[in-house]
Amino acid sequence: MKRIFLLIATNLAVLLVASIVMSILGVNTSTMGGLLVFAAIFGFGGAFISLAISKWMAKKTMGCEVITTPRDSTERWLLDTVARQAQQAGIKMPEVAIYQSPEMNAFATGPSKDNSLVAVSTGLLYGMSQDEVEGVLAHEVSHVANGDMVTLTLIQGVVNTFVIFAARVVAGIINNFVSSNDEEGEGLGMFAYMAVVFVLDMLFGILASIIVAYFSRIREYRADEGAARLAGKHKMIAALERLRQGPESSAMPAQMSAFGINGKRSMAELMMSHPPLEKRIAALQTR
C-alpha cells in the first residue's frame, strides 16, 4: 500500500510540476519533438536528481551512522574489510555506515564509484558470522565497482521518458478521437485530459517498473559473481543461505532495496528487484 501511495503521489507531482513549467516557459508539446524533449527533461532529470542526492537521502532515511573512528573491534574489522575489497575492486574507499534495524540487510548507494556509501544493518552485522558478513560486503562493493547505481539511473531515465511521452501521445489520440465524434469538437476538456494522462502514466509506469526490475535482477547476479571473486564463492553462498533462513526484508525503502543484499519477496517475480535467493544460490553453485 505504501509503495502504491508513493507511485500515485509521484505521478501527481510530475503532472503538477510539468503543467506549471509548461505554463511558465511556454513549452509547446503539441509536436512530437517538443513532447519528446519535455519527456526527456523530466524523465532523466528526476532520475539524476535522485542519484545525486542518493547518499544524503540514504543517511537521512535509514538513520545511517557513518564510521569515521571505529569504537570497537567489530567496527574496525568492518572498515578494514571494505577497504581491502575496495582496493581489490579498484575503486575509492566508500563511506561505511551502520544503521539500526533487526533485519539482516545491507545496501550500497552513491552517485559514482568514487563517491559511494556501503551500509549494513545491526541485525546483519551481529546476526551473521564474519564470513557471511564478508560475502555481503563484497556484494555491495561489487555493486559500486560495476557502476550499478549509474546504470540503473540511465535505465530509469529511459523508461521515465517513455512513460511521460507515451502517456501523452495516447491521451492526444484519445482526445482527437473524442473531438472528431463531438459535434462541438471540444474534445476531452482539460480535467478529463489530465485524468486520462494520469491513468496512462500509472499503466505505463507498471510496465516500466517491470523493465527496471528485470535489469535490476541481472545486476544482482553480476554483484553475486563479483562477491564470489572478492570474498570467495563459499562466503557468498553462506550469506545467501543465511538470508534464506531469515524473515522477509521489509523495512528498507525501494530506492535503497534495489542495491541491497536481500530484496522484497513477491508473488509476481516480474516485479522483484532481486532474483529469489534459491536461484542466486544455484547460479553461484554452477559457476
From Swiss-Prot:
Query: Its topology with respect to the membrane?
Result: Multi-pass membrane protein
The UniProt record gives the binding positions of Zn(2+) as H139, H143, E220
Q: How is the cofactor bound?
A: Binds 1 zinc ion per subunit.
BP terms from Gene Ontology: proteolysis
Q: Can you tell me where the transmembrane regions are? A: 4-24, 33-53, 154-174, 195-215
Query: Which cofactors does this protein require?
Result: Zn(2+)
Q: What is its EC number?
A: 3.4.24.-
- Report the GO molecular function annotations: metalloendopeptidase activity; zinc ion binding
Which InterPro entries does UniProt cross-reference here?
Answer: HtpX_protease, Pept_M48_protease_HtpX, Peptidase_M48
Q: Which NCBIfam families has this protein been placed in?
A: PRK05457.1
Q: What is this protein called?
A: Protease HtpX
What's the source species for this entry?
Answer: Shewanella sp. (strain ANA-3)
